[in-house]
Curated annotation (Swiss-Prot):
Its primary physiological function is unclear. Has cytoprotective activity against internal or environmental stresses. May play a role in neuronal development and synaptic plasticity. May be required for neuronal myelin sheath maintenance. May play a role in iron uptake and iron homeostasis. Soluble oligomers are toxic to cultured neuroblastoma cells and induce apoptosis (in vitro). Association with GPC1 (via its heparan sulfate chains) targets PRNP to lipid rafts. Also provides Cu(2+) or Zn(2+) for the ascorbate-mediated GPC1 deaminase degradation of its heparan sulfate side chains. The normal, monomeric form has a mainly alpha-helical structure. The disease-associated, protease-resistant form forms amyloid fibrils containing a cross-beta spine, formed by a steric zipper of superposed beta-strands. Disease mutations may favor intermolecular contacts via short beta strands, and may thereby trigger oligomerization. Contains an N-terminal region composed of octamer repeats. At low copper concentrations, the sidechains of His residues from three or four repeats contribute to the binding of a single copper ion. Alternatively, a copper ion can be bound by interaction with the sidechain and backbone amide nitrogen of a single His residue. The observed copper binding stoichiometry suggests that two repeat regions cooperate to stabilize the binding of a single copper ion. At higher copper concentrations, each octamer can bind one copper ion by interactions with the His sidechain and Gly backbone atoms. It comes from Ailuropoda melanoleuca (Giant panda). InterPro entries: Prion, Prion/Doppel_b-ribbon_dom_sf, Prion/Doppel_prot_b-ribbon_dom, Prion_copper_b_octapeptide, Prion_N. Residues 25-241 are annotated as: Interaction with GRB2, ERI3 and SYN1. This is Major prion protein. Residues 54-103 are annotated as: 6 X 8 AA tandem repeats of P-H-G-G-G-W-G-Q. Pfam families: Prion, Prion_bPrPp, Prion_octapep. Monomer and homodimer. Has a tendency to aggregate into amyloid fibrils containing a cross-beta spine, formed by a steric zipper of superposed beta-strands. Soluble oligomers may represent an intermediate stage on the path to fibril formation. Copper binding may promote oligomerization. Interacts with GRB2, APP, ERI3/PRNPIP and SYN1. Mislocalized cytosolically exposed PrP interacts with MGRN1; this interaction alters MGRN1 subcellular location and causes lysosomal enlargement. Interacts with KIAA1191. Cu(2+) 4 binds at H96, G98. Residues 242-264 form a propeptide. Residues 55-107 have a biased composition (Gly residues). Glycans are attached at N192, N208.
Amino acid sequence: MVKSHIGSWILVLFVAMWSDVGLCKKRPKPGGGWNTGGSRYPGPGSPGGNRYPPQGGGGWGQPHGGGWGQPHGGGWGQPHGGGWGQPHGGGWGQPHGGGGWGQGGTHGQWNKPSKPKTNMKHVAGAAAAGAVVGGLGGYMLGSAMSRPLIHFGSDYEDRYYRENMHRYPNQVYYRPVDQYSNQNNFVHDCVNITVKEHTVTTTTKGENFTETDIKMMERVVEQMCITQYQRESQAYYQRGASVILFSSPPVILLISFLIFLIVG
């Protein structure tokens, strides 16, 4: 009987301590809230204050008070007070104030433009899909690949390919797979844009391609485009599965519960 009472008191004490810790976490810190000691616009009874606090009493019309229209008070329009538009106060737009917007004492804190936020979805998509190529209408450049070993049906063509394969592209241009209805359309578009871009770029450097080069280049690029399609399709379905997983109600409830435990 005594042991059960002791266990009950220990449980009550533990719950009380846990509640007190939770309240301490949620209790506002002194000096950091609105109209507290650390506020830029403190109230009449606040321990802290502006850089130029009122110097006198608190009656209206007194020479050193804090009422409206006093010469040395803290009311609106006073020459040495802390109200709005005062030359030495701490209100909005004052040249020597201590905490308002655009004041000299803030050192441009409120005037600095906010930094643009990076969209993490776009960053992740660009990293997974490849870099978007400017001037090619939304095409992306895939990662470098090893040129495949292809047999063209004759010893001459096989030897010619082995001797000239370094002149052919090892990267392909493509668009996201969700813009195509099937693999054939993706590969066809990928081959055309890659061969065209590589041919134009190489020709401007003073190197020309023969009909044999174009034939072999199309075969090589076709194999590379098929590989690129398989990679992109797999990555696309994996991203879709991840979105479905994290959008399911049980997962959302679990994540919300974990966040509640961490924050609370």
